Amino acid sequence: MSTNPFDDDNGAFFVLVNDEDQHSLWPVFADIPAGWRVVHGEASRAACLDYVEKNWTDLRPKSLRDAMVED
């Protein structure tokens, strides 16, 4: 049985962010999807998870946060 590359504790990852400030761990061997950009890495899965935990503190999409400020 093969390991899911997104769950590989020994893999190398990037942290990606989209225009809504949503974060994703992404294996370095995979193409970066349209609409996403690298903000951290190449690093271990643990280091990337640490980055996400420290930097993605508000899970609401950016458009929702912006709309709530305008009201």
Swiss-Prot record:
Pfam families according to UniProt: MbtH (PF03621)
Organism domain of life: Bacteria
Matching InterPro entries: MbtH-like_dom, MbtH-like_sf, MLP_fam
Matching Gene3D superfamilies: Structural Genomics, Unknown Function 30-nov-00 1gh9 Mol_id
Record GO biological process: siderophore biosynthetic process
GO cellular component: cytosol
Physiological role: Could be involved in mycobactin synthesis.
PANTHER family: ENTEROBACTIN BIOSYNTHESIS PROTEIN YBDZ
Protein name: Protein MbtH
Natural source organism: Mycobacterium tuberculosis (strain ATCC 25618 / H37Rv)
